[in-house]
Amino acid sequence: MQRLVARAPAKVNLTLRILRRRPDGFHDLASIVAFAGACDVVTLESDAPLGLAVAGPSAAAAGPDADNLILRAADAFARHVPGARLGRFTLTKRLPVAAGIGGGSSDAAAALRLLAQINDIALDDPRLHAAAREVGADVPVCLDPQARIMEGIGERLSEPLGLAPLFAVLVNCRVPVPTADVFRTLGLRAGEDLAGLPHEAPMSTGRAAVMRHLVLHGNDLEPPAETVAPEITRVKAMLAQEPEVRLVRMSGSGATVFALTDDCRAAAQVARRVAAAEPGWWVRPTVLR
C-alpha cells in the first residue's frame, strides 16, 4: 500500500470573457487562468477500498462525501481504465466552497493525478483527460496546474503561458455563490452572443505586460455576481482603497476577489489589514503562476 499526497491549488480566472450561450445551454468562454499557492490537499492510500474522508476547516461546507467530485473522478477513471488500481482518499479542505476558484475541480484533478501515478499513466494520456472532462468543465485545466488560456466550455487549453509570478491577495467573504444563479442573472438566451472586446493572449509574459493586459480584459461575470451577492462589491471596494493594490478583480463566478500587488511583502501587508478588519472572511496572500 502506498500513501501519496497531491496539492489541489485554487484556480484563479485572471480574465473571463463570456462569448455566447450555446443552443445546448452551455456558455462558450475564453479565460486566462492561473493557480495559487493556496490549496486543498488530497491524499490517496492505494489499493484500499474506494472511499473518501473529508477534513479541514472547510469540510462542513463541502457537503456529503458521496457527492464529492473526487469520488466522481475515481468512478470516471475506473470506466476509462478498466482494472485500474484505486484506493481511499482523504481531502483536507482548506479553500472556501462555491467560491469561484475551482476548489472542487482542482480536488478532482488532484485525485486523477494520484490515480494516474499509481497506475503508471502519463498526464497527457487521453484516457485521463476524457475522465476529467466527464467530471466537469474546469477539471482538465487543473490536471497540470499552470497558467493557460481555456476556451470553449473549458475543454480547449493552450500550452502553458509561462507567466511571470503575480503577487496577490485572495479574499472570500464567506458568501457561497452558485454558478447557475450568476449565469441566470447574466440572462443570455440560447444562441445569443455577449458583446465585448475579443479575448486575446498577453503580448508578453512579463509582469508589467500582463498587468497592462489585465486592465483591458476583465470578468464578464462580475456584474451579475454582484447582483446575486452584493457583498462582493464591498470586498472589491475595500481592496481597491489599499495603497499597495494595483488591480482588483473577481475570479470565476465569485465570490472570491483577488488583488494584485507589486511584491509578496505588499500582498502580506494588505492581507493582514483586511483580515484584521474582517476576521470572518477568508484572506490569503499568495503567488499566482
Swiss-Prot record:
GO function terms (MF aspect): 4-(cytidine 5'-diphospho)-2-C-methyl-D-erythritol kinase activity; ATP binding
The keyword Hydrolase is annotated on this UniProt entry: no
Pfam family, one: GHMP_kinases_N
Residues annotated to bind ATP: 96-106
Alphabetic keyword roster: ATP-binding, Isoprene biosynthesis, Kinase, Nucleotide-binding, Transferase
Keyword Zinc in record: no
Cysteines engaged in disulfide bonds, as pairs: none
Pathway terms, separated by semicolons: Isoprenoid biosynthesis; isopentenyl diphosphate biosynthesis via DXP pathway; isopentenyl diphosphate from 1-deoxy-D-xylulose 5-phosphate: step 3/6
GO biological processes: isopentenyl diphosphate biosynthetic process, methylerythritol 4-phosphate pathway; terpenoid biosynthetic process
Catalyzed chemical reaction(s): 4-CDP-2-C-methyl-D-erythritol + ATP = 4-CDP-2-C-methyl-D-erythritol 2-phosphate + ADP + H(+)
Active-site residues from the entry: 11, 138
Catalytic EC class: transferase
Task of the protein: Catalyzes the phosphorylation of the position 2 hydroxy group of 4-diphosphocytidyl-2C-methyl-D-erythritol.
Similarity comment: Belongs to the GHMP kinase family. IspE subfamily.
PANTHER family in the cross-refs: 4-DIPHOSPHOCYTIDYL-2-C-METHYL-D-ERYTHRITOL KINASE, CHLOROPLASTIC
Annotated NCBIfam families: ispE, PRK14608.1
Name of the featured protein: 4-diphosphocytidyl-2-C-methyl-D-erythritol kinase
Organism: Azorhizobium caulinodans (strain ATCC 43989 / DSM 5975 / JCM 20966 / LMG 6465 / NBRC 14845 / NCIMB 13405 / ORS 571)
Lineage: Bacteria, Pseudomonadati, Pseudomonadota, Alphaproteobacteria, Hyphomicrobiales
